[in-house]
């Protein structure tokens, strides 16, 4: 009986402790939730200019920390900065190299920004980029025998090839959009999976049926010489002002679509507040599919520019630059604003160009450039991803 009484008292005491601790735990959780709500409110209420200011401040801080790391590792930070500037803008070749990277970052960055701005996560831009590139090359090679050689035929083939790339990229983007809108599938998972599928299928085609006759390397046949962007201003292989002009034109068109059209309004509303959009008469599911298709089409155009301006053929995508993945950081740096993608792409293009120069002409490890880019991504992505997560999960003190 005594033991039973002691156990009963012990049980009652434990229950009292649990009841006593419960309100404190609830208070702690409540305070933490209120703190998250306040932070979410501030991020969600921030204007585009405020978000860009946060991105610029984060980038500046990341660059300063990067220079501190350079100094700690035993290198002269001022000499490092000099090498970066020289590698990015030191001469005509450096500028052309920087603008080449910038062109690709702008196009792929806009593709990411379209989806992210609408509240959906298209992580499959790299796959859509690869599909668009191969589609461009093969459509041009197949159609070339039916069109006259020369400038006129070359322009027609470029237009047809780029259009085919946009269609292929758009279809690749539409699939995860359909799965999300009508099957409630997580688009992050589906787009990542489609990246692997795209790279695998394109790699098989380049190494097999589409491999150029007599090629030792897994490449397609080269495009006809008259199917190329003209070398204007810069006489540098791998870059043409025409490619940059296409990228800037895409930025303008996307900006106008997103800010001046009903589709742009529906796109953003459906992504962030699907129930409210449906109540207002918007077919939210159809709009999500259209958004992913639009994003994929721009990624396909990026692949077309890469194939025509840089390669002149198509190779195993395993060796193709990962512009589609880097574009996620570019878009986040620009606060998912298509206009902001231009300076963000220039920053990444300049750093990539500088890394190429430093790797050849300096004893400074090129990995330091990668480290600085990583810091920029970390500092910039954290607040923007928190804002996007808050919008998607309903964080915030107000009803949204």
Language-model segments: which ranges?
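Transmembrane helix-bundle core of multi-pass membrane transporters
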Residues: 187, 191-256
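Helix-loop-helix "hairpin" substructures at the membrane interface of multi-pass membrane proteins
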Residues: 239-312
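Transmembrane alpha-helical segments in multi-pass inner-membrane proteins
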Residues: 299, 303, 307-374
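Single transmembrane alpha-helix segments in multi-pass membrane proteins
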Residues: 69-73, 79, 87-143, 162, ...
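Interfacial/capping segments of alpha-helical transmembrane domains
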Residues: 65-88, 208-221
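Hydrophobic alpha-helical segments embedded in the membrane of multi-pass proteins
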Residues: 102-111, 128, 171, 193-196, ...
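Alpha-helical transmembrane segments within multi-pass membrane transporters and channels
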Residues: 148-189, 193
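Cytosolic-side transmembrane-helix boundaries in multi-pass membrane proteins
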Residues: 1-59, 68, 272, 279-286, ...
């Amino acid at each position: 009986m005594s033991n039973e009484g002691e156990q009963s008292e012990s049980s009652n005491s434990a229950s009292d402790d649990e009841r006593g601790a419960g309100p404190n735990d609830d208070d702690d959780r409540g305070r933490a939730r209120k703190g998250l709500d306040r932070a979410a409110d501030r991020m969600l209420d921030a204007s585009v200019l405020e978000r860009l200011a946060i991105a610029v401040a984060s980038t500046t801080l990341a660059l300063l920390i990067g220079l501190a790391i350079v100094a700690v590792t035993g290198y002269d930070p001022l000499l490092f900065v000099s090498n970066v500037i020289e590698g990015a803008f030191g001469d005509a070749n450096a500028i052309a190299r920087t603008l080449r990277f910038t062109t690709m970052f702008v196009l792929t960055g806009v593709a990411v920004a379209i989806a992210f701005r609408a509240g959906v996560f298209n992580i499959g831009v790299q796959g859509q980029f690869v599909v668009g590139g191969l589609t461009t090359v093969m459509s041009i090679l197949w159609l070339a025998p039916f069109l006259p050689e020369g400038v006129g035929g070359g322009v027609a083939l470029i237009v047809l090839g780029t259009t085919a790339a946009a269609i292929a990229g758009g279809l690749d983007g539409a699939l995860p959009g359909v799965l999300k809108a009508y099957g409630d599938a997580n688009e992050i998972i589906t787009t990542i999976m489609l990246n692997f599928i795209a790279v695998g299928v394109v790699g098989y085609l380049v190494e097999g049926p589409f491999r150029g006759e007599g090629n030792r390397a897994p490449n397609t046949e080269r495009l006809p010489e008259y199917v190329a962007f003209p070398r204007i201003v810069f006489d540098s292989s791998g870059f043409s002002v025409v490619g940059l002009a296409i990228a800037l034109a895409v930025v303008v068109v996307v900006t106008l679509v997103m800010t001046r059209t009903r589709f742009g309004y529906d796109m953003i509303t459906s992504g962030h507040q699907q129930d409210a959009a449906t109540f207002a008469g918007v077919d939210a599911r159809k709009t999500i599919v259209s958004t992913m298709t639009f994003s994929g089409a721009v990624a396909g155009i990026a692949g077309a520019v890469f194939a025509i301006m840089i390669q002149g053929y198509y190779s195993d995508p395993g060796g193709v630059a990962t512009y589609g993945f880097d574009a996620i950081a570019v878009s986040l740096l620009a606060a998912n604003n298509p206009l902001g993608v231009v300076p963000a792409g220039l920053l990444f293009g300049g750093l990539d160009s500088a890394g190429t120069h430093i790797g050849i002409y300096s004893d400074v490890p090129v990995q330091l450039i990668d480290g600085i880019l990583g810091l920029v991504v970390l500092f910039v992505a954290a607040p923007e991803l928190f804002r996007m997560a808050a919008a998607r999960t309903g964080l915030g003190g107000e009803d949204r």
